[in-house]
């Protein structure tokens, strides 16, 4: 069962894991009717005082333009969203250097894609595993683990209980 306590804590602890501050700007292109948007994005920003840069609907060009124009420091998405952004013919026209972090979740996250995102978008990828009923994140790679181990070595997000 989802409670205010676990939704608030999940958003807060995810932000802590990603070192969010009030200086961050999160580009939100995931749906707000889903736990990815409402907990990992909205609650994260509410508990850390971050700015949310809302994209009306997912369109790789709109996302790239929003990150570029607003100088976003974080970006969330599922693997297919990142593939669409990286493969967009106008990708090289946008400055992604303001990005420092983001979440890739919702599906298996290929290590090669995570490497491409880090190289081309300059952001450290946090791959979160969870489920809606857990509000939603349960595990994420420990911050000391290198990307090559991201697919196999995970740490439980703080305060997770049975």
Regions found by a protein language model. Give the residues of each.
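Alpha-helix capping/helix-boundary segments
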Residues: 59, 81-82, 109
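Gly/Ser/Thr-rich phosphate-binding loop
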Residues: 18, 47, 64, 69-77, ...
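Thr-Gly-centered strand-to-loop micro-motif
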Residues: 23, 28-29, 54, 103-105, ...
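Active-site phosphate/pyrophosphate- and oxyanion-stabilizing loops and adjacent acidic/basic residues
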Residues: 12, 115, 152
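Adenylate-forming AMP-binding core of the ANL superfamily, especially NRPS adenylation
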Residues: 108, 147-162
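Conserved AMP-binding A3 loop
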Residues: 1-9
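Conserved AMP-binding/adenylation subdomain of ANL enzymes
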Residues: 8-25, 33-74, 88
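Structural detector for helix-capping/boundary residues
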Residues: 4-5, 30, 70, 161
């Amino acid at each position: 069962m989802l409670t205010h306590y676990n939704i608030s804590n999940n958003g807060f602890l995810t932000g802590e894991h990603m070192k969010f501050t009030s200086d961050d700007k999160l580009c939100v292109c995931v749906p707000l009717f889903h736990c990815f948007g409402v907990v990992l994005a909205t609650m994260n920003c509410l508990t850390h005082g971050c700015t949310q840069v809302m994209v009306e609907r997912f369109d790789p060009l709109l996302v790239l333009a929003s990150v570029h124009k607003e100088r976003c420091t974080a970006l969330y998405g599922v693997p297919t969203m990142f593939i669409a952004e990286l493969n967009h013919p106008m990708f090289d026209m946008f400055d992604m250097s303001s990005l420092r972090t983001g979440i890739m979740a919702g599906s298996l996250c290929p290590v090669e894609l995570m490497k491409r995102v880090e190289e081309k978008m300059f952001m450290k990828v946090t791959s979160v595993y969870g489920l809606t009923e857990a509000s939603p994140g349960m595990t994420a790679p420990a911050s000391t683990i290198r990307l090559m181990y991201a697919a196999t070595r995970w740490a439980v997000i703080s305060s997770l209980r049975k």
